[in-house]
Amino acid sequence: MQMNDISYEILDLFKKYGADKEGILKILEADSRPEVLYALSDIRRNLMDWMDFSGQENVLQLGSDYGVITGLLAERCDHVAVVDERDENLVVNQKMNDAYTNVSYIKAADFQKMETTEKEGKYDLVVLRSDRSEMDIKTIFAQAASYLSEKGRLIFACENALGFKLSFRRCP
């Protein structure tokens, strides 16, 4: 089930209730739409909460979403670089994770302009969210894998009806 993007609505709700944990709880009490639950509920941490992030110091998250997963990564890893095509998603994420000083937010266009040596082979973990069905999956995986360090891991997170949890390691 594909959720509608409600970034601007979430930003309005943050203005009204706040973006801290207390404010988010108030938002969830006041607005029970599935889109709001999807965007703000910390239950979504279950997607990766079970994973061991030992040795995953430098993380690249491709696809910001609203920031629930970013918060989990920021708690467990040394640095998280979040890349998204939508500025408003980065703003929502940044407001949700304002307490973390180890997260940097990068617009996708700026990330693409970075020199290859600045990003290829630099990340211990790449978290790839795929909500762009128009892109070729082989191209997406090849590009994401190029950012991994030699022993890096790639996590591919997508909406799926069966709830599979898969993780891939870089193969030589």
Residue ranges and their predicted role:
Residues M1-G18:
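N-terminal auxiliary segments of SAM/dcSAM-dependent transferases
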Residues Y38-E57:
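Conserved alpha-helix/loop element of class I SAM-dependent methyltransferases that forms part
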Residues G55-D65, F156-P172:
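Conserved class I S-adenosyl-L-methionine
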Residues Y66-C77:
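Conserved SAM-binding loop of SAM-dependent methyltransferases across substrates and taxa
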Residues N93-Q94:
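Conserved SAM-binding loop
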Residues E115-V126:
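A short acidic, Gly/Pro-enriched loop at the edge of an enzyme's catalytic core
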Residues K138-R153:
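A short glycine-rich, Lys/Arg-flanked "PGG" loop and its adjoining helix->strand segment in the class I
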